[in-house]
């Protein structure tokens, strides 16, 4: 039985699985305190919450606080992944077909997770390896801290510059930063100073703060190197979600990924999955970024 090559809308259950797999490859998704929401564009009204309770004497006049609401518009972007395989897959038995297709979808879901970090942190297209026009990179808008030779002091400096309006509930580490922190030991005992530092995307902790590690933090595909070591702050300020309608199609003809090779001519078919992200950074002052001294950027120390 040949595969159906029409463009199909993935069922809600499958779309939800792909969305959750994005959490396994994105530090932003991993550190977000809430589940990803499936939505299109969204306007956020930022509520500053500066009111304080007033002590009122018997019969005294009561005063109010006028709240200012600042709108932040979500930024929407479309993502796609295309994977070429041998056209013989169309005629494979059902078990083999299911296994291979599942691996393709898992690989594409992982790519969709990584692209979230690349767009939000760096305004960068990881496939084309180009800067995205019209996007504001968090690496440039967050409060900058220049790294020193003392990584413990660097963590303290990051925490100091985050606006005191916000809680610190997450830190995203580059692999370089995570490895350096794991090497720090208490001189008197030899124990690790940060024993729960993660070396992968499984959330660990640093000083009680949820932590995740990935090459997307520094943007390993970006040249020249960004020099970014970590982002720390209130990750609830990064609102993101994926559209529920995730499309997948099997393409038999043409050159859908612009490789210069026609699918029929090389006996291949292509799997393509498309989705739509939307995100907004409510206040970049609630997040700090640690950069090596050689990288450019403003310093808040």
Regions found by a protein language model. Give the residues of each.
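Alpha-helical scaffold segments that mediate packing/assembly in large oligomeric complexes
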Residues: 84-164, 289-301
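Structured loops at beta-to-helix junctions and adjacent beta-edge loops in soluble globular domains
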Residues: 47-49, 86, 174-176, 214, ...
């Amino acid at each position: 039985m040949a595969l159906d090559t029409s463009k199909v809308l993935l069922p809600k259950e499958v779309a939800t699985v792909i969305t959750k797999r994005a959490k396994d490859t994105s530090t932003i998704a991993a550190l977000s305190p809430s589940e990803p929401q499936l939505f299109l564009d969204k306007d956020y009204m930022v509520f500053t919450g500066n009111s304080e309770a007033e002590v009122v004497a018997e019969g005294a006049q009561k005063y109010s606080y006028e709240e200012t609401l600042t709108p932040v518009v979500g930024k929407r972007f479309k993502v796609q992944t295309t994977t070429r395989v041998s056209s013989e897959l169309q005629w494979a038995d059902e078990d083999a077909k299911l296994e291979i297709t599942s691996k393709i979808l898992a690989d594409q879901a992982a790519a969709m997770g990584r692209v979230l970090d690349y767009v939000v942190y760096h305004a960068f297209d990881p496939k084309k390896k180009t800067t995205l026009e019209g996007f504001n990179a968090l690496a440039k808008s967050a409060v900058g801290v220049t790294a020193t030779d003392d990584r413990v002091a660097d963590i303290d400096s990051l925490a100091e510059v985050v606006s005191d309006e916000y809680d610190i509930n997450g830190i995203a580490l580059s692999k370089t930063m995570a490895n350096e922190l794991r090497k720090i030991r208490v001189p008197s005992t030899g124990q690790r100073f940060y024993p729960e530092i993660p070396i992968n995307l499984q959330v660990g902790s640093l000083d009680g703060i949820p932590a995740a590690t990935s090459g997307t933090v520094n943007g390993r595909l970006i040249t020249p190197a960004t020099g970014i070591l970590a982002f720390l702050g209130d990750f609830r300020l990064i609102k993101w979600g994926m559209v529920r309608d995730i499309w997948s199609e099997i393409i038999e003809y043409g050159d859908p990924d612009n490789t210069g090779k026609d699918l029929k001519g090389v006996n291949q078919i292509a799997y393509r999955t498309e989705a739509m992200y939307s995100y907004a950074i409510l206040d970049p002052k609630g997040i700090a970024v640690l950069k090596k001294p050689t990288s450019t950027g403003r310093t808040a120390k």
